[in-house]
Structure formats: C-alpha cells, structure tokens
C-alpha cells in the first residue's frame, strides 16, 4: 500500500515522503495515529494544501525538542530502590521509574523517549541513559540509583 507520511517515522522517512508499506501497518498504526494518509489523488491534493502548515508544525516540534534536549542534557536523576547488601536491587529500575524521577525534578519526559538498549538497571550506582526526543535530537542524563530507606 502506498502512503504519504505526515510526520517523521523512524525507518520509513520524513514529512511528505511517498512510501510503500504493508497494508496492516498502514491501516492499524500509521493512519489511525495521524502519521500517514493513503496516496490516492484526493488525499494527495489535500496533503499539498496542508503541506506548509505541517512543515511549520514539524519545525516548531524540532525547536521545542532542541530546547528540551538542552535543558535535560547532563541532568542527574535520583531513583530510590530497595536493594540487598551486595548492591543488587530487589526488582529493577526501568523507563517508568526514570520518568517519575524526572517529573519529581520538574522535567518533562515520556517513557518512549528513554532508550535502554541493555535492559533495565539491576544494581546500585550511576548510569548514563540516552534520550531520543524527536527525530535526530538526543540528550543524555545520569541516573543515580540509591538505596531507599
């Protein structure tokens, strides 16, 4: 199925690209989430009419994400967790706990933005965590896992 992207989609393309994807991916994810529209003549004309508006919206999101990256970069987030004598956690620290720690400091962060390619944190200590905010805009925060008393 051919579609026109209304937003940047990782692995597919950016705004205005005409790409071919599987029908299920388009119908069940891209189109309902407003990331794409079918590439039929009427929809193409509608997209071209809205193109400038969508490009401005994307530019605003990029600028806002760059500003957020600047404010988040280098921050230290403290997460409290129960741990044994050897520093092993009872459970683990994942994206949800990192987002909660950011919110406690007044920082806005979403679970999808936290990248943990090596899995959850299972020991006390400091860890550098990558954040993928929007498109190519990334930031890094330090997560300090300490014992909860």
Curated annotation (Swiss-Prot):
Lineage top rank: taxon: Bacteria
Which Gene Ontology cellular component annotation is one that this UniProt entry carries?
Answer: ribonucleoprotein complex
Keywords annotated in UniProt: Ribonucleoprotein, Ribosomal protein, RNA-binding, rRNA-binding
Q: Which GO terms describe its molecular function?
A: rRNA binding; structural constituent of ribosome
Q: What InterPro entries does its record include?
A: Ribosomal_bL9, Ribosomal_bL9/RNase_H1_N, Ribosomal_bL9_bac/chp, Ribosomal_bL9_C, Ribosomal_bL9_C_sf, Ribosomal_bL9_N, Ribosomal_bL9_N_sf
One Gene Ontology BP term is: translation
What family does the database annotate?
Answer: Belongs to the bacterial ribosomal protein bL9 family.
Instruction: Relate the protein's function as given in its record.
Output: Binds to the 23S rRNA.
Name the chain's protein: Large ribosomal subunit protein bL9
Q: What's the encoding gene here? A: rplI
